Amino acid sequence: MERIDPDELAIAIKVLRQIPELHPDHEDVRTMKRAASYMYKLIKKSRRAEIRMERQRHDQEIIERTATGSRMRIDDETAGIPLVSTAQGAFAGELITARGCYICKEDFTLVDAFYHWLCPRCAAMSHAKRDQRTDLTGKRALLTGGRAKIGMYIALRLLRDGAHTTITTRFPKDAVRRFAAMEDSADWLHRLKVVGIDLRDPTQVISLTDDVAADGPLDIIINNACQTVRRLPGAYTHLIDGENAALPTAESLGVQALPEMVTFDRISEAHPAAIAGALSSTAVAHHDGESAESALAAHNAASMTALALKAGGASLEAHLAGTAIDAGGLIPDIQANNSWTQVLDEVDPLELLEVQFCNSIAPFLINSRLRPALRAAVQAGARRAYIVNVSAMEGQFSRRYKGPGHPHTNMAKAALNMMTRTSAGEMFETDRILMTAVDTGWITDERPHHEKLRIAAEGWHAPLDLVDGAARVYDPIVRGEAGEDLHGSFLKDYEPSPW
């Protein structure tokens, strides 16, 4: 209603003026009091709602000035480059309504320019950890799942700090394109080795360990690769096409040489043949240049990689337009449901097996079979050797509440934690190997597509980004090189946490 009819309003005013002439106990007076009271409550309720909305708008504007709370950011998409805040100065502003810090849980109102969900003290600590470095010159590192997202940022830290780094991925050519595209790649690309492998296939994992061990002492193992929610095969279409396209020449990229690349058979299949039961055979390694089906132009593959490294590639607007490519180079899965919300009897047996092989069995095989190489590094003069098992809160037993969803990923991470807790003490006492499990923090939202878009539209964003996740994984190595022996711990937000 825009306005009250003037004649009716005049009648109402006339009646109100007559009310005081009646006896206070008159029925008409009581009726008018009830009506006036109801009207006053409605007006008061409406005003409270307006004030609440004004406060929410004020606070949301401050949140959106931050890097992690920006409207351009959704899920784990971070443009493949560091996030940027639009705030001027160290802080984005002051909230009217206090919110709890993601790390320390204390309420705060002063919002950091970068982190929308951290109090000033925890934000300052996180900034310092994001930038910490250590000298790894001459050391060798093996990093699984190093092509994109957290893995890419871990690999960049290792390479920029001087380590000779071997990364594994199911899409090795995409990895080469990504790393070669970095502005400073000429400084370290010659120390990168890319291994195309499917960690869900134990025969390939064993072949990988043999290949790594043959190269001599190994200083660092980071078991980062994992399968959380199985994507539809179509999500990988562009990446698979890119594996059939030729790589650019080193000269065109402005570098002396491309990284060494080794690939195994059938690395890009939807499911490992051994697990699916279709066939089984021995994994065979192929070095770069041996097989080249260039059915599609390399330009298209490079374009898809560039999209994954472009700001806003997976923004809410891009999702709604159907053009989104996330930081991993994947097409978003638009299924109404996925295994993140599935309960015990709903999880597909094949996905159950894949998750166990990738998330816990592959790390077990890698750690056990490469232990002699780690021992050799210490014997050759290294202060310590390192194993970092990238875990998650899903594998923690001490949480007060466990929801019924994704039991298969929970049990895989719990197994990884138990391997760490069981073996870390003995490995340190015997061989001076520091093994820890690390939670990367809340970076990704694994909920089904429609729900993810809904909460993004409402202004929700994960509190941390990919660089924060990488910093948490890298931290035990930095601290170890500084003389602090962290082992047998489950680290959350850089501190030991209950198992």
Model-derived segments and spans:
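Active-site helix of classical SDR
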Residues: 367, 412
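N-terminal alpha-helical interaction blocks
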Residues: 1-98
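SDR active-site lid
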Residues: 403, 407, 424-425, 429-483
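Canonical Rossmann dinucleotide-binding motif of NAD(H)/NADP(H)-dependent dehydrogenases/reductases
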Residues: 127-172
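Short cysteine-rich clusters marking metal-coordination/redox-active sites
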Residues: 101-104, 119-122, 387
